[in-house]
Amino acid sequence: NSISAAAAAAVVALVVAFVWSDIVGSAGVIETFAMAELPSHTSRVADGDNVVVQTPSATTSDVLLPDGSRVMLGSGSRLEYPSDFGQNGVREVELTGQARFSVRHDAGRPFVVKSGNMSTKVLGTVFYVRSYHGSASSVVLLKGCVSVSSEDGGKGRMLSPGHQAVVDDKGDIKVEKADMAAVGGWTHGEFCFDDSRLEDVMNDIGSWYNVGIAFHSRSLLSVRIHFNFPRSVSLADVLQALNDLGVAQFRYADGRVSIEQK
């Protein structure tokens, strides 16, 4: 059953759907997101022949690439591109985390995003990419056309607007309709979930606040909820709102949120 949550703020937004790998701990706890080492503020530094932009938790950053393409970099994310970006005939970036890309059209210079074990190739379009450590990589297309392939160099899959591709740890690509009700909530400062799996909700919260996520019951992973809430509030406020839903018990301690049966 779907459970509705009253929210402090709601937003109509596009949503990126994503899939996370389950890591089962020694005590049977299912860890779906791990805390990472992040900078205290957004940084942009030269690293050899590359430029690296990194964001801390609970922060987004707008990046203008040399070709005029724009990237909205999500919380706890890292974007890397060569200092001579595009001069060799290919515009290529590497992403860890999540980002919204608005790519300037250039028929002579394809734009390629390397993320985890996935490669996304475009000429000019708007799309979201999500690829945190320990998770499957995914891309959602808003407009235009993209080709998605795994790092093993297999045949690419074409996406049409409103669809997503998910590449699992074996390199298999699954293409399906995206849950467009909440894909871009983070770009508008909102958590926006409509009949979404609790695992997906919690992993998004984990990536925003940079906290680990651990489920103490596998059955809770697939519980579906409606949850709209501002990202500007504290983690404690978000967990209180989730506890008010009554679907599970949410507790934070030692850098990790634990989700248990009530």
Language model features with spans:
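A residue-level detector for the "anchor" residue at the start of short, highly conserved motifs
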Residues: 2-6, 11-262
